[in-house]
Amino acid sequence: MPSFDPQDLAGWTGGSWFNEPKVAIEGLCFDARQIKPGQCFIALKISARDGHEFLEQAARGGAVAAIVENTKPIVLPQLKVSDSLVALGAIGAALRSKFSKPVVGITGSCGKTSTKEMLRCLLGEDRTHATAGNWNNRIGVPMTLSGLDSNQQDFAVIEAGINQPNEMVQLGGMIQADLNVLTNIEAAHLELLSSLENIASEKSLLAELAKPGSPIILHVDSLRFNAYKKLAHRAIVLLPEGVAAPDLPSKQIVRYKVSEQMENLGANRALQASQQVTINGQNYPIASPSEGIASNTALAIVAAKYLGIVESDIRKRVEAWRPSGNRGYLETFREQTFYIDCYNANPSSMADALDAFDRSTPQNIARFYVLGAMDELGTTASAHHEAIGHLLKLRPQDRAAFVGSKELTNAYASAISPQQCICTDNVEKIKSTIAQFQGAIFLKGSRKYSLEKLLPSKNLNLNP
């Protein structure tokens, strides 16, 4: 992370120093428990927590300064601003404007993080600065931008996530992307965004606020939304083989195909499933059974080509990539094979994961479906959960468990025999049941349900 001159921080934020530090500042941190010597602590008010209460702890941890809304009579130098979160955004925007290398902005309803990780891999991890985990909100984006350094990095890949109106205005304005990537527009965060058209309109602001004329790479079905139709002249459109082309110049269209690869690991084990993406006659094997991940990998490949990565490096890096952070892969523990995709969920990603799990599991193996509720779907939540429940075709030897509120778990279970399913509000209540099951186990749900707690291993890391 680059160092900052205290006077620059004051200029970017419009703040005033009280006891200005005499040394350069070595990065930013908003969690006093994780402060490193030389950093500046940002006192943010997050939910019920007020960062101003932790100034002394930050100082003890080695902070050389703090950004505050209200100063405290302690030795620690403090930069007083009107709003700490706005100040953080101003710092992120300032550092973005100083970065001279290509910046890729990624958004979408699902698949943002896996697409970001794939593109980071394709561009070369050692020289690519990217969002950590899914740190993609009003705090995460400027914190990510604060690590930009043109002397150390050749590319930046920044993920932007929203769940309410007007968020992307702030994020897109900070990111100022040179290249935009949209994974998809699906039913996610409907609670505050209310419709798919509204979601598309909000997410399109990433491209609207990007560098003038910067391209946007997207799948053809995203052009059904008015917000993206307006951007079609800037689009690089991925089109599945056999699908009619939109009315665009041929140079804007990239044909691709996703095909499945299977390797049988034995009569009592799940198949080793993977996907293959074909673009312009080149085949790229992908270590995930998810068709959604494969389709988004196609976006990352096209982005890497646009940014000048040579074909041999792209192919080598695609083959080396592995899903991470509990996002779409198979893992076997003795007599159990888990399909692990439990970082988050919405109706589209849930349907894709169920399809991948069912295709990856031989017919003779019993299946246990564990579905956490899908949050932030607003008034349509019950209908979406009921529709997903109807996708489960349980055989006599199969079982299901649904974790979440009574309303949503009952919606999941509406088409399933009570003798074959469990509805619960807490994952802890089904641990012993899962531990005793022999067969293939599906795990997916919204983040709050922590379905990874059902895994035998305690060493899986959600944010590698």
Question: Model regions: which residues?
Answer:
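Peripheral docking tails and interdomain loops at the edges
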Residues: 439-459
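Active-site beta-alpha connecting loops in nucleotide-dependent enzymes
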Residues: 48, 324, 342-417, 464
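Phosphate-binding loop of NTP-binding sites
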Residues: 7-10, 88-220, 224-234, 457-464
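Short acidic-hydrophobic, aromatic-tinged amphipathic segments that line or gate anion-handling sites
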Residues: 79-83, 255-257, 419-430
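Acidic, Mg2+-coordinating active-site environments of NTP-dependent enzymes
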Residues: 69-75, 181-337, 362-365, 390-399, ...
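ATP-dependent carboxylate/acyl-activation modules
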Residues: 106, 112, 325-327, 448, ...
